[in-house]
């Protein structure tokens, strides 16, 4: 038996060998990098041995690849190193404190650096690309034009009518469909059975139900699924693509009285699917605030989360045209906590900073300017991922200072194992600045800390989904006390056009229900949740709601009961559609009046 090949030998042979003539099964680089358990155990044993064992490993490397072996020996002779002994195990370390075995592995995979997620093309390349697109627009005159999503104000039912008829027919031809659907005046109507379970004999008003509906495939086409006024069981409204849907069902008082003696039975709900096409989310920015001046949307003046008693970090700001590069040092982190289910849980970490421009002659951002920050930066501690970014910024023109805060985002869970000492001491971000008037949507704080979605990163994505944003749980949500919880986020916005956000459910979520409501400018974001059982816990960072852009109308969905149904009102020769007390804007909900 010969000597077993080492990991370095395997990698050397794999790199130097020519490609085989026959295809081989795909193997990830991680599988190549991580040795099997037997090899890993041998590596640990080799680390615990004396210098003789380590020289033997060097000889194996030199035998497999003399250049690699010579390079390793030269590095050891030149760099030296130190030996740290813990108990009976001697660990060889280089000057930078990294164990040599780990340093060797990092050297082999040195091309797998974390900077790959943050690299961008040079500004002159982007500028030249945009100019080339403009030249192409002139050549394309009279043909198609480049899409400007903010210009689209309304959708038309005629663009989808034949497709709606088609998916209705597909639904009716399914073998498991007992109640046929019908397409009438732009909407799909269907009846669906709901199982009433009263085996305990006490009766209840709220239940949970699954329904199967026609399904749409267009990226921009959704449905408002809700019950009509003729239903004895009211399915609470959903925004869905169709297919299998789960929602909370509410029984009216008459149905509850009639079903007291029934243990398990069937009731029917009359459903309507209203075609829904949201507006594409516009480009956003965050205005610079000034001391003593109210922020965007009526937010408190100054910097969000700023605490005078806490120490400030130091920021150094360098201007590169319209871009500000900010380097923050000496950060001191403060934990924000909330009491949930009798326990205080960490919701996020926050640190504040202040500083001046590197160049005394460089101009500070003005009150009429707004900013867009670089993407969230990922950090890892004990295998737990969390992200950090700038939260809010304030410009003090008198002191020529820039004040601000950085914070962890709600898009990831902040574990109790992470403490303030584990948080980064230094941080860096850049700001793209421009005039506020160039942005239709302006948030009071960095929305990347609260939401996720392609609409926040459109310039860097191919074929992004610009029709929705996802809201994440800011803390662990417990339903042990009551099945209904309302989550409030201190984030506001101002929108110049007559648009607002529709807060809706997550697609295909059956563990909890998110109440449909309208989030208007100047108000904090509120998300109301119901759960099926009181033992459910929604961890921090879990998606809890979806945001859609709609044309602003009158009213809102104030209650979630048997009155939350689809209805229409006729007045002065016009027909208006409502969901509960909320008027459905005709620009987004594509309905035609009944004849």
Curated annotation (Swiss-Prot):
Keywords: Glycoprotein, Host cytoplasm, Host nucleus, Host-virus interaction, Inhibition of host innate immune response by virus, Signal, Viral immunoevasion. Residues 47-94 are annotated as: Disordered. Residues 1-23 form the signal peptide. Interacts with host CGAS. The keyword Membrane does not apply. Glycans are attached at residues 176, 197. This is Protein UL31. GO terms for biological process: symbiont-mediated suppression of host innate immune response. The keyword Glycoprotein applies. GO terms for cellular component: host cell cytoplasm; host cell nucleus. Plays a role in the inhibition of host innate immune system by targeting host CGAS and promoting dissociation of DNA from CGAS, thereby inhibiting the enzymatic activity of CGAS. It is found in: Host cytoplasm; Host nucleus. Disulfide bonds: none annotated. It comes from Human cytomegalovirus (strain AD169) (HHV-5). Residues 69-82 have a biased composition (Basic and acidic residues). Belongs to the herpesviridae U10 family. InterPro entries: Herpes_U10.
